[in-house]
């Protein structure tokens, strides 16, 4: 049986925890919070460390050195990371839902995720090329497809 169906998040070992990440890259997108409404908006401006084709961090093990504001996702803080998309495996499992049909642990590769449009592949730009984040607000990362 799949480990994510038999263990609680806090019971996962580091390898299992890391494997839950589908590598979509959505958590690496810059977000904006509206000052008046507190509404969260995603942009297509990705962290400078994100490889936008492979959808993974170029310096994952040193990311906190390069980007001090980068957030580590842990079982202890998942409830407070309200900016994570609903499609995030950590969020889904925290909410008592299963992994989606396109998840790499289910399919064996990232291709189904990319084909379902659930990653930032081909959709993001580097944050260093962006002048005004407000001009880069997008809606596509928010959908959740099973």
Curated annotation (Swiss-Prot):
It comes from the Bacteria. Disulfide bonds: none annotated. Pfam families: CxxCxxCC. InterPro entries: Puta_zinc/iron-chelating_dom, UCP006173. Belongs to the UPF0260 family. This is UPF0260 protein Sama_1927.
